[in-house]
Amino acid sequence: MSGIYIHIPFCKQACHYCDFHFSTSMKKKEEMVLALAKEIRLRKSESDGENVETIYFGGGTPSVLTSGEIDFLIAEVYENYSVVENPEITLEANPDDLSSERILELSKSKVNRLSIGIQSFFEDDLQMMNRAHNSAEAQKCLKEATKYFDNISIDLIYGV
């Protein structure tokens, strides 16, 4: 099994528990997307002809990308690698990025799995972690996502 992980090192804000490298400035986002596309092309020779079964957008917060940027990067993978007929394509997302309109938009793309960073349904925990969403928003986005996606995971932090 072969998969491609695409790291998106941007976030709207810093969560207090996060140790990952990221930037809250979006000034270089377009430049980074183009650099990722170049990296996808440059790494083509390392694939040994294996079929790509999964494409995973992780981060940071990949849901800060526009649908056009996501589609562009997926197209780069398809153009440069042998991709199975129905690959699992995951986008990590925060609830505050998943409006009803955005979920519908993503459902029309090749993304077929959402990994939603809810972290907690408790308001005190969310505030302490400096999350941008509240519990009601998390529940609403999860309910909305289930209308359009059959494959959803959520991140929860235990014992905060």
What are these regions (language model features)?
Residues 22-46, 50-160:
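Conserved non-cysteine loop/helix-boundary elements of the Radical SAM core domain that shape
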Residues 9-20:
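Local cysteine-cluster metal-coordination motifs and their immediate loop/turn environment
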Residues 6-8, 118:
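Alpha/beta-hydrolase
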